[in-house]
C-alpha cells in the first residue's frame, strides 16, 4: 500500500478545509497504516488547545484530532518555524503529540510518502 501524507496548511475556522482533511484522514486510516500528518503554515493553529469555534458560529472539530492515536496514526509533525512565525512556542501543549521539526527536516520526512493530500 502507498504511504499517504496529509498536510494541514489552513487555519481551522476560516473554511471547511481542516474539517474535511480530518475526515479524509480518518477514512484513509481504514485503508492503510502508512499515514503521516504534517502541520505547516496556518495549519499549526489546528492543534491549539482551548479553541472556542462557537464564538464564530463554527463547528468544534478540533477535539477529534485527539482520536488520531485510537486510529493508530502516530506520525505527526509540526513546522517549528511556522509556529514561531505566528507567535507560538513549538513547545506548546498541542492537542496531539507532534514532533516539531525545522523546514528542511520536515521536507525530508514528506519525501518519504507516495501520495500527498493538502488541506
Swiss-Prot record:
<dbReference type="InterPro" id="IPR003787">
    <property type="entry name" value="Sulphur_relay_DsrE/F-like"/>
</dbReference>
<comment type="subunit">
    <text>Heterohexamer, formed by a dimer of trimers. The hexameric TusBCD complex contains 2 copies each of TusB, TusC and TusD. The TusBCD complex interacts with TusE.</text>
</comment>
<comment type="similarity">
    <text>Belongs to the DsrF/TusC family.</text>
</comment>
<protein>
    <recommendedName>
        <fullName>Protein TusC</fullName>
    </recommendedName>
</protein>
<dbReference type="InterPro" id="IPR017462">
    <property type="entry name" value="Sulphur_relay_TusC/DsrF"/>
</dbReference>
<keyword id="KW-0963">Cytoplasm</keyword>
<comment type="function">
    <text>Part of a sulfur-relay system required for 2-thiolation of 5-methylaminomethyl-2-thiouridine (mnm(5)s(2)U) at tRNA wobble positions.</text>
</comment>
<dbReference type="Pfam" id="PF02635">
    <property type="entry name" value="DsrE"/>
</dbReference>
<keyword id="KW-0819">tRNA processing</keyword>
<dbReference type="InterPro" id="IPR027396">
    <property type="entry name" value="DsrEFH-like"/>
</dbReference>
<dbReference type="GO" id="GO:0008033">
    <property type="term" value="P:tRNA processing"/>
</dbReference>
<dbReference type="InterPro" id="IPR037450">
    <property type="entry name" value="Sulphur_relay_TusC"/>
</dbReference>
<dbReference type="GO" id="GO:0005737">
    <property type="term" value="C:cytoplasm"/>
</dbReference>
